[in-house]
Amino acid sequence: MICVVIMRHQAWQSDGLPLSSSSNEACKLYDAILSQYVTWRNDETLGGIEGCITSIKAADPDFVMGHVISTGLELVGTGSSVLRDERLASAVRRTVELADTQQLTSREKNHVKAVQLFSKGALHKACEVWECILADHPTDLLALKFAHDGFFYLGEQTQMRDSVARVMPHWKPHMPLYRQIKGMYSFGLLETRLYDEAEKMAKEALSLTPEDGWSVHAVAHVHEMKAEVEKGLNFMASTEKNWTVCDMLACHNYWHWALYHIEKGNYEAALKIFDEQVSQRCVKSGAMLDIVDSCSLLYRLELEGVSVGERYRELLQVTQPHSEDHTLLFNDLHFLMVSLGSKDTGTTQRLLESLQELAKDPAENRQLQIAERVGLPMCQALLEFEQRNYRQAVELLKPIKQSFVEIGGSDAQRDVFSQLLIHAAMKSGDKEHQQLARCMLMERDAVRPNSPLTDRLIQRAHSLHA
């Protein structure tokens, strides 16, 4: 059972974060939703996040921050798009309309503004607004977590780290969820390659809260990025009972566990985790993080020459409804892996054509603004690789390989695209491409020494190019 610290209306006011609602119940539920979001853990005694959202609307239907957190969470989840989901678009409009008719604090008004900007795809502008909130209210945890997620989607790794660093001195050990701030900062540290500092910070958090799934996740990343396979396997196994209680993150942590097995060449073990954990959790939750993890795991295995059977077709049932959402290019690329793996040319065509059409008039949408330069070439490269046009795949990816970060996600998640370029370059008949593959493998070996996967790829390159 999760320990949710329930704060009443007066407590929020005492902390300098007043909530414009006359309902103590609504304020308590707001706190419960925020706590579950930050801890990645649904509290079933409260009905989970969904149950709390239903209850908060009943307690105070006009509570603006209740609408901000419920609508904001759906937007940040990236599983729905206002372009295709009128219910979500209506929820955003309702939030703005309520704010226009009430006397709110400037902090609350800025929260509404940020949610509206995020709904338009203006993630960078939304993050600027959340940062403005944090400048005056450094303990506003909703602004901090939304900004953290926003910077993650933008690939703004330094900002993701520094956004937390700027507010940490204002957080004290007695404050609710203080421990989770350490985990957030740890993730920012590791995404800026400060691995030792990241591991130290995450383990400090875990010494206080062993079931902190996000800090477990940070340590898993450190071992992945340093190719510390045995350490990673032992760590995940020894802490499994702790982090599986974080139901919104457990699937992703199993994904990390499977990556160690792929790194080691234990493909059957990786498939076992996919079948018993990742796939089942993905279907059950429908959460976008779980979906892209499933896509990525199958694709990585195929790059290694592993047959995944009918798994792509089964996963297509989950990804297909999202093929024209276009909330994030990162998501689109993963959906494309599945439609290509399933040989579903219709879904592939719809995804590419609809993205091309939206990219013609991106407006404020940051993802669509970079689609033509980064996203669409990456999509086309996946298609060319699937059709064994390796030379074309390399020509598409090589000029933008330093721009992969702009699609968002973590270094570990985006590594699949670096692997794709290496495989395409190795298989290309072009001598310059083959040289590129060898150079990328040397780069990889320098920053991740003792990587079994890199060693295998180097051996493969030598045998192909001998």
Curated annotation (Swiss-Prot):
CDD domains recorded for this chain? StaR_like (cd05804)
Superkingdom of this protein's organism: Eukaryota
Q: Which UniProt keywords apply?
A: Repeat, TPR repeat
**Signal sequence, start to end:** none
Which InterPro entries does this entry report, sorted A to Z?
TPR-like_helical_dom_sf (IPR011990), TTC38 (IPR033891)
Provide the residue intervals of the TPR repeats.
175-212, 251-284, 368-400
What protein family does this chain belong to? Answer: Belongs to the TTC38 family.
Instruction: Give the protein name, as stated in the record.
Output: Tetratricopeptide repeat protein 38
From what organism does this protein derive?
Answer: Danio rerio
